[in-house]
Amino acid sequence: WEQQDIHLFLERCHWETRLWVDDIEVGMQNALGAPHQYDLSDVLRPGKHTLTLRIDNRIKDIDPGENSHSISDHTQGNWNGVVGDMYLQVRPKVNIARTIIYPDISDKSVRVKTILRNRKKSQTTALLALEADGKRMQKKVTLQPGTNEVDAVLSLGDEIRLWDEFHPNLYQLKVSLTDEEQNTTDSREESFGMRDFKVVDGCITVNNRPVFLRGALDCAAFPMTG
């Protein structure tokens, strides 16, 4: 793990977390709808360390109301802690931090915004490649130290498979990053659907077809199992 990025991943927290490495405070995160991720690269050194995590479920910045279904005693309860995956993740110094996919059914392509992180102290060059459904494109990028944003468009050919509730076709996008020595330093895969979602004359449409949405509210009403 030497000379690598190291992150702590916490999948579902309720809901404010604060982290220390030994006696050094790393930071605080406060979110219900997304994992908490801490970058430990600058505070970890070879050797033994103690990670201390404090979970605070008091009603403060996030206030759903005392009788909301997420925290009231007669439904879910105001639980405290972390559930799901909790692990340390090692990443290369030049890595793919995030990918955001924008389908374009009229152009039969996807625009991919890729957030690349260069934790080296100097500028570096790399080759960014996108591949889906047998189609591939690559782009040479120059990365400054820190966070870099790269836009690229991948054409999917003349025949595309649209996504909707009756035909939930999905594509798999592979994003890879290759260094100057032709070594793949990082890669990730994301799934996406080719669909157009908009509002026309007050109606929601998917691929230009009106859709009607409905939901169900169960209120945690399962007395035998909680």
Language-model features, listed with the residues they occupy:
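Hydrophobic beta-strand positions in extracellular immunoglobulin-like domains
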Residues: R12, I55, L88, I101, ...
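Accessory beta-strand-rich segments of carbohydrate-active enzymes
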Residues: W1-N95, R119-K120
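Active-site-adjacent substrate/metal-binding segments within catalytic domains
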Residues: W1-L10, H14-D22, G27-M28, Q89-I100, ...
